[in-house]
């Protein structure tokens, strides 16, 4: 089955692609697109190949192609979240979490490599630097938990596991700062639920405008 997504809206592309993924269990799929190609890992393997082609690389003339795909699916792959805790100077249950995922894409095929410097050695480097500073000077009223999450690239598995199996009551978590792709933050930080927590959002904006540099 050959499907062109050229000219489709973003919402349409998501719906069509979701349907094509389901169809890939019963037949081979070729998707024609002009979107930027990306690489990711999956929690399952398709029964048939799902191939994405650039419009310029596709010929509408009749013909056949032959491909040889080598893949290996690990049904039981173990990965672990890594935790560190710096207690507040005063006894408290209030906690701030600083997190970063430590897995990365690795490589695509035999020739394309993703060393992972930006995604996400940069986040882990920042996490360790913050831990080093806070270890010497802990916060007065907040515990700080540092979490290096596993299996983010496969669908946020490590962070989801932590939420479903928390090491502390989630009501005690006052704030979470996730460090990811720190080398290319030209557009700033992504703030989730900023409209629900306007006070905290405005505080972040105030701190950002001060342009405090780590020393």
Label each residue range with its predicted role:
Residues 139, 149-215:
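Metal-dependent peptidase/peptidase-like ectodomains
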Residues 3-11, 15, 70-72, 110-120, ...:
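Second-shell loop/turn segments in exported
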Residues 8-10, 35-38, 90-91, 102-106, ...:
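Solvent-exposed loop/turn segments at secondary-structure junctions
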Residues 33-116, 129-141, 164:
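Soluble metallo-hydrolase cores and metallopeptidase-like ectodomains found primarily
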Residues 120-127:
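Alpha-helical transmembrane segments that form the membrane-embedded catalytic/substrate-binding core
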Residues 10-22, 68-69, 80-84, 160-163:
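Short alpha-helical segments and helix-capping/turn motifs at coil-helix boundaries
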